[in-house]
Regions:
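Extended basic (Lys/Arg/His-rich) segments that typically form rRNA-contacting surfaces
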Residues: 1-136
Length: 136
């Protein structure tokens, strides 16, 4: 498409492609102050976490010789002989796709040939991560 390589490549469904040509960048000029948008992004991950941090359980006793203070409870009953679905366990926490709805745009700032869109709320993800803004 005679353009330089980009950092992100994203397909957006439900858009009339006749308005755009191959290799054309979509600038932030389409947004105006006071407009309401939906913001979609990937949240920050917390890695492998235990039951206390992941599910806010109380944990075990901390005194009188107990060494399992931050572990979870029983994995289940004797009868089904398996762990039932939905039972909380330690494991990977977060890193999921989140959409925040009805976020208003406060301002647009033009700085060094870049247009920054200032939103009224916090956004999901780390710095320099990809966000999708959907106009309502």
């Amino acid at each position: 498409a005679n353009t330089t390589p980009k950092r992100f490549l994203k397909e957006i469904r439900g858009v009339d492609v006749s308005e755009y040509s191959l290799g054309k960048e979509v600038q932030a000029d389409i947004f105006t102050a006071g407009e309401v948008v939906d913001v979609t992004g990937i949240t920050k991950g917390k890695g492998f976490q235990g039951m206390v941090k992941k599910f806010h359980i109380k944990g075990g006793w901390a005194t009188h010789g107990h060494k399992f203070t931050r572990t979870g409870w029983s994995k289940g009953n004797r009868k089904p002989r398996r762990t039932l679905k939905g039972h909380p366990h330690a494991g990977h926490m977060w890193t999921q796709r989140v959409t925040l709805k009805n976020i208003s745009i406060i301002d647009k700032i033009v700085k060094d040939n870049e247009t920054l869109v200032v939103l009224k709320w916090s956004i999901p993800g780390a710095r320099n991560s990809l966000l999708t803004l959907t106009i309502k």
